Amino acid sequence: MDILHRIGIQNATPEKVYDAITTLDGLSDWWTEKTEGETGLGGVIAFRFIPGGFDMKVTELDPGRLVRWEVVDGPPEWIGTTIRWDLEQRGDYTIVLFKHEGWREPVEFMHHCSTKWATYLMSLKQLVETGEGAPSPRDVAISDWH
């Protein structure tokens, strides 16, 4: 089972969006301020939230087109899943097709994560379009789980 989202980022090149997804500064400006690690191929990036977090291994990079990570540590539901970002220029927009692939079953946590991914993707869009995102802990609280 997969979580799927699509956003369009206006007046931004795929390379600019790619940089926001593949650099520590970019990631900490839209996803979580507590981001560290190695963002190159084979590197592991640690993302920390209140509470908890997860580690992602960078498994594929195609500049301006594709980013793929494998979850190597974190909540049991996430371990072994993959995060994929496909980027494509369409007119004045960079289209981002986002996939969190490989969920074993549609547990309540998957529902929560799907909504949180949507809020973080809007933060990515906001960052690239305006220069300011809404990363954790300044993100939108969607429920009692945050």
Predicted regions located by residue number:
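Hydrophobic ligand-binding cavity/cleft-lining segments
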Residues: M1-E36, H146
